[in-house]
Swiss-Prot record:
Keyword Cytoplasm: yes
Keywords for this protein: Aspartyl protease, Cytoplasm, Hydrolase, Protease, Protein transport, Transport
Compositionally biased residues, Low complexity: 368-388
All copies of domain Ubiquitin-like, residue ranges: 1-77
Localization: Cytoplasm
Protein name: DNA damage-inducible protein 1
Function: Probable aspartic protease. May be involved in the regulation of exocytosis. Acts as a linker between the 19S proteasome and polyubiquitinated proteins via UBA domain interactions with ubiquitin for their subsequent degradation. Required for S-phase checkpoint control.
Subunit structure: Binds ubiquitin and polyubiquitinated proteins.
Organism whose genome encodes this protein: Cryptococcus neoformans var. neoformans serotype D (strain JEC21 / ATCC MYA-565) (Filobasidiella neoformans)
A GO term from the CC aspect: cytoplasm
Region (Disordered): 315-396
């Protein structure tokens, strides 16, 4: 039988037999509650005093699977456990404070989330003790206020607003229980995850690349492209706007540059984006092209039989250490994920055109009529007269334009795609679908 002994300031549970004598129960209480037998008065949950030490629990009707008795000390009032001075209490508090001081990760979290406790820990034992007492007082006040609100809400069971508040309170209690369960059984879920970076070389220049399988394209910043000496290969026909949660300007595309991963030298294409928070983002296009495997069990990026280790936290670039991972990922991933589709000759960025009327060489106007006649005749001899550049829609076959329109591209974008691909419909279609 499970016997619960409820004292004024504590609760004790014991597995006992119903045939146990009351005297034995008194001895148990004496040992657990540290009270002399003369001041111990036991009462059953039915209010029956257990005064005869020679009788058993069963004789008082306490013979079920569980039973409860109440302990009521007599004589001089007994101080509660919270008011009894324990000589080891300060030592325990100091031990707790020193443990916190010896945990740099905990101290960093306290500095950001609870500066008051952080200052109390650094202020010494008494300061930390006052902070603990204040926290306990706040907890008691919060429990009291919670109970008061529950009583106020239960005062009118037909009040719809009160019932909604009760429902929300129940929901929040479930949320807190779920959080406490997670903190107890999976505390690692509350830690920060180190983003995946690797050491690479672009055109012989060392770069720390961010590996992101959620980004559609591989991205490089203009500054990094300049440092690597590949900005001269930028194809501005692929300029546009990348739109996700935010927007970023696509300067163009570098179709092929040499990148070194481990001992492998591989070709890699880059989209050049302004305002990115990383120098190089290794996206899904290159991961799939080179059949890379992100192996988190070995913390490596595996390409065939070559393994490139991911960088540890202290090796990350300064940008990644200074900024939160969620902020970095949010700024990079969305624009990268839609970079190609939104960035191929996007009409949002005006395309640079030749600053003239499109006349052939030698057909420009002049001040003298003789010069104009001579120029026109000379031009006519070479080109058959004034030759205007055909409009973009006349340069390409109508069937090719219609093919791209049928695939979902507006007519203007279809013409731009054909210009970017040199009239190759298959290449233009691949650009359309990223």
């Amino acid at each position: 039988m499970r016997l619960t002994i409820i004292a004024p300031d504590s609760v004790h549970e014991h597995e006992v037999s119903p045939s146990l004598l009351i005297q034995d129960i008194i001895n148990i209480v004496e040992a657990t509650a540290d009270l002399p037998p003369a001041v111990i008065v036991l009462t059953s949950d039915a209010g029956t005093p257990l005064t005869d030490p020679t009788r058993t629990l069963e004789s008082y009707g306490l013979n079920g699977e569980t039973a409860t008795i109440f302990l009521t000390p007599t004589g001089p009032p007994v101080a509660s456990s919270s008011s009894i001075p324990f000589p080891d209490a300060d030592a325990d508090i100091e031990r707790m404070r020193l443990q916190a001081l010896g945990n740099p990760s905990l101290m960093n979290d306290l500095r950001e989330r609870d500066p008051e406790t952080f200052a109390a820990i650094q202020g010494g034992t008494q300061s930390f003790k006052k902070a603990l007492q204040l926290a306990q007082s706040r907890q008691r006040d919060a429990e009291f206020e919670k109970q008061r609100q529950i009583e106020a809400l239960n005062a009118d069971p037909y009040d719809i607003e009160a019932q909604k508040k009760i429902e929300e309170a129940i929901r929040m209690e479930a949320v807190l229980e779920n959080m406490q369960h997670a903190m107890e059984y999976s505390p690692e879920s509350f830690g920060n995850v180190t983003m995946l970076y690797i050491n690479v070389e672009v055109n012989g220049h060392p770069v720390k690349a961010f590996v992101d399988s959620g980004a559609q394209t591989t991205i490089i910043s203009p500054e990094c492209a300049e440092q690597c000496g590949i900005m001269r290969l930028l194809d501005t026909r692929f300029a546009g706007m990348a739109e996700g949660v935010g927007t970023a300007r696509i300067l163009g595309r570098i179709h092929s540059a040499q990148i070194k991963l481990g001992s492998l030298y591989l070709p890699c294409a880059f989209s050049v984006l302004e305002g990115r928070s990383v120098d190089l983002l290794f996206g899904l296009d290159m991961l799939k092209r080179h059949q890379c495997c992100i192996d988190l069990s070995t913390n490596t990026l595996r390409i065939n039989n070559t393994e490139v280790p991911f960088l540890s936290e202290h090796e990350l670039p300064d940008k990644a250490r200074r900024r939160g991972e969620a902020q970095v990922a949010g700024e990079m991933g969305d624009a990268a994920g839609q970079g190609v589709k939104a960035g191929v000759a996007s009409p949002k960025i005006g395309k640079k055109t030749f600053p003239g009327e499109g006349h052939a060489l030698g057909a420009g106007s002049s001040t003298g009529p003789g010069t104009a006649t001579g120029s026109a005749s000379a031009t006519g001899a070479r080109t058959g007269g004034t030759a205007s550049v055909p409009s973009p829609s006349n340069r390409w076959k109508e069937d090719d334009i219609q093919t791209l329109v049928n695939l979902g591209a507006p007519r203007a974008q279809a013409i731009q795609l054909l210009e970017a691909s040199g009239g190759n419909v298959d290449v233009a279609a691949s650009m359309l679908f990223g």
